[in-house]
């Protein structure tokens, strides 16, 4: 098993350091269960977004192999276009030879320029990997670098350090109680069925919908009308897609309870309201997708900080246990 420590960037992003090439160069990457490709900024990129980051220099690596393929990725808040190469990648002490990785030529969108990380390491299923690239975890598995075909996340709160992702194992010190296992409904993202969402015992949204468990998204993302219902139920107002609560009365706000695979998972206001007394926003945002198309939720870090999560590829299940 391989353990990678992650830095908590203001409770919005979690990234760890990997190395690529020979001799190894270090890069900060987000370990993202919502995508499947590995990519980093590279010397091919002259865009402003790349200038603030470590750039991978393939010509300086003796183990680099060209593939002749290109890769194009889009994310909720940005993207990356570039070429696909192959090199040795080291994660948490485990060395992964012949790993396919994207090298950015352009990184459109303002998001990447200010980002504290140099790239993204995707941990979703190979079926959604762009350019047919083999994801890092699959490649490590095929080379027997991990004991078990699962990985797990602990995300710290309050800006604290100590966050980790364990590839090939489970860290029992990071959770209490029992693990609640949920079947994956589509082997693309880590997608699960959500039975319903209640506030004060009443259904607020989603009578049977789908959710993606996504460590690379900071908020809980909801369809527009579902978010409006929940805001009404907890007495919050909206401002440009950000939900405002009455900060002084956070303690008196109700839990938002998500029922997943028959088990109630309550989210207390201390978890979904962020900020201080003067100004606060909720950790829920809108996907901009009307609910009548397909009611898809994203469980981002606001939700995941409350749980130790285990992603089991052998049995295609996600495990949730209360974080310790």
UniProtKB/Swiss-Prot annotation:
Q: Identify the keywords attached in UniProt to this record, alphabetized.
A: Aspartyl protease, Digestion, Disulfide bond, Hydrolase, Protease
Cysteine pairs forming cystine bridges in this chain are 45-50, 206-209, 247-280
Molecular function, one GO term? aspartic-type endopeptidase activity
Matching entries from PROSITE patterns are given as: ASP_PROTEASE (PS00141), PEPTIDASE_A1 (PS51767)
**Residues in the signal sequence:** none
Q: Does the keyword 4Fe-4S apply?
A: no
Q: Fetch the SUPFAM superfamilies from UniProt.
A: Acid proteases
Catalytic residues, per the record, are 32, 214
What Pfam families does the entry give? Asp
Kindly list the biological process annotations in GO that this record carries: digestion; proteolysis
Q: What is this protein called?
A: Pepsin-2B
Protein species of origin = Gadus morhua (Atlantic cod)
């Amino acid at each position: 098993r391989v353990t990678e420590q992650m830095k908590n960037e203001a409770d919005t992003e979690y990234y760890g350091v990997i190395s690529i090439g020979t001799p190894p160069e270090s890069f900060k990457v987000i370990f993202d269960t919502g995508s499947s490709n590995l990519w980093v900024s590279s010397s091919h990129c002259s865009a402003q977004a790349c200038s603030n980051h470590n750039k991978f220099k393939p010509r300086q690596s003796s183990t680099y192999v060209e593939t002749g393929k290109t890769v194009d990725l889009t994310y909720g808040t940005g993207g990356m276009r570039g070429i696909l190469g192959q090199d040795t990648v080291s994660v948490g002490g485990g060395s992964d030879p012949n790993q396919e990785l994207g090298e950015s030529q352009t990184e459109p969108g303002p998001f990447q320029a200010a980002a504290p990380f140099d790239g993204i390491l995707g941990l979703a299923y190979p079926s959604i990997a762009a350019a047919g690239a083999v994801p890092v975890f699959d490649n490590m598995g095929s080379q027997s670098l991990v004991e078990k075909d699962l990985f797990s996340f602990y995300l710290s709160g309050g800006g604290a350090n100590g966050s980790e992702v364990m590839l090939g194992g489970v860290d029992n010190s990071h959770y209490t109680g029992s693990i609640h296992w949920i079947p994956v409904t589509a082997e693309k993202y880590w997608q699960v069925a959500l039975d319903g969402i209640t506030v004060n015992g009443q259904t607020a949204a989603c009578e049977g919908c789908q959710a993606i468990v996504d460590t690379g998204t900071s908020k809980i993302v909801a369809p527009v009308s579902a978010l409006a219902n929940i805001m009404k139920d907890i007495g919050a107002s909206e401002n440009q897609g950000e939900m405002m609560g009455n900060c002084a009365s956070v303690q008196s706000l109700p839990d938002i309870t998500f029922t997943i695979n028959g088990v109630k998972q309550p989210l207390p206001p201390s978890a979904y309201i962020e900020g201080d007394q003067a100004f606060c926003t909720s950790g829920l945002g809108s996907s901009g997708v009307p609910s009548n198309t397909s009611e898809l939720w994203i469980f981002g870090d606001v939700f995941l900080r409350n749980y130790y999560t285990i992603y089991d590829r052998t049995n295609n299940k996600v495990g949730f246990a209360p974080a310790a």
